[in-house]
Amino acid sequence: MEVGGDTAAPAPGGAEDLEDTQFPSEEAREGGGVHAVPPDPEDEGLEETGSKDKDQPPSPSPPPQSEALSSTSRLWSPAAPENSPTCSPESSSGGQGGDPSDEEWRSQRKHVFVLSEAGKPIYSRYGSVEALSATMGVMTALVSFVQSAGDAIRAIYAEDHKLVFLQQGPLLLVAMSRTSQSAAQLRGELLAVHAQIVSTLTRASVARIFAHKQNYDLRRLLAGSERTLDRLLDSMEQDPGALLLGAVRCVPLARPLRDALGALLRRCTAPGLALSVLAVGGRLITAAQERNVLAECRLDPADLQLLLDWVGAPAFAAGEAWAPVCLPRFNPDGFFYAYVARLDAMPVCLLLLGTQREAFHAMAACRRLVEDGMHALGAMRALGEAASFSNASSASAPAYSVQAVGAPGLRHFLYKPLDIPDHHRQLPQFTSPELEAPYSREEERQRLSDLYHRLHARLHSTSRPLRLIYHVAEKETLLAWVTSKFELYTCLSPLVTKAGAILVVTKLLRWVKKEEDRLFIRYPPKYSTPPATSTDQAAHNGLFTGL
């Protein structure tokens, strides 16, 4: 535990006035997000301080011990369904070549394994799956032994290690960690890994494959996906905001320009077009959805984050691409057809998601209209300044400096508005500044990520949820606060007192309120597309299967 311990903090003075305000809503495919699964009651390695409050948003209860977790989560990169060409040309070695006896392998803070019910290795975060086949066999034996007694194994705790299991259909996912993450947070990462696999093959294809042959080697169909999974896990550890908050991050942009870009997307329609997205560096500029296609089945932020990570990959650094995409939250058994293109040789990326296989040329025509419209608006220069194109090829492209808040002592923060109109819930969003000194080095960013995970687990504890946490660590002070209107995590200088922290947070909330039109998409645009030219397209593409 960090030096100084934790002390309960009262609600900041003047907080009620602030709460009355409305807060609307290299290669990368990392991510984004669903609400993390709430911590298990057993996860109480840290002393909890603070008090319950009726303003605390409800936290869902964990599933029963024998219940299989079936939901999927945000932060994946899609590819093609079975027997369809994949979008990414990458191939990967599947990590380091060590085994459990290798010191370098044992020194890793966290391992993730994927294997089939029959014990067939599929993926390992570190080390080759061949060298780890015996280890994965032991995992399969543990799961089978518990299942034979009519139960399901969820987690094993051993000193400072956690071993978390997740059964998803014919696949078994295991996380072994000595980080400060709770079992529930590790389970959320496993759900993200599973969703990555589903987005590549679709859930129905995976089930059909193993129903036909239980010991099938799924790596044949996932060739090249190992590095994608590696990047996914790296991004969740280094930039946990999207996963913890279940939201997407937008590029800060003046509202008139963002509205003009949204109107431009609304005017560019094609038969079967369901969703149009403008993004840069894995962050959202604006998006427009078709009224009818997504009216009853809203696009989950996890699926949107999936798309943002996907279009930010180096595979789409130039030119245009056309590929099928499975969105596991929308329909894990079906897929869309996606048109992806870089605009005017800039990092700005256009994504058009449709339901018709033969719509490539219609989508390409939309791309030309969008390019012409953006030049007419002078949007490229504004987007270049807003998104810092010098580093926009990565998903961690800087958006703005924490110095813009004008609150001395504030180092970093994560902010998600909660009290937003219903039509904004289609697009949960959060904002955070770029990480600057003293969090320039990877180990420092990792340490800050651990602190955010720890605070999140305690705020959303199922046994004793907290509303406000003031935590004094060795190198920084942190304040986490959740109300009915927002969820906030702040990192402050270690010299900031409790009273000073309250003043900094109050100033931050006022700044966010002032800048909300620039930080968030407050009015997501909608449009209607022309009728489809073929009556059998919906049945063919499987988009609405199971809805």
Curated annotation (Swiss-Prot):
It comes from the Eukaryota. The modification Phosphoserine is found at residues 59, 61. Pfam families: Fuz_longin_1 (PF19036), Fuz_longin_2 (PF19037), Fuz_longin_3 (PF19038). Residues 1-15 have a biased composition (Low complexity). Residues 1-106 are annotated as: Disordered. Induction: Induced in fibroblast KMB17 cells by HSV-1. Belongs to the MON1/SAND family. This is Vacuolar fusion protein MON1 homolog B.
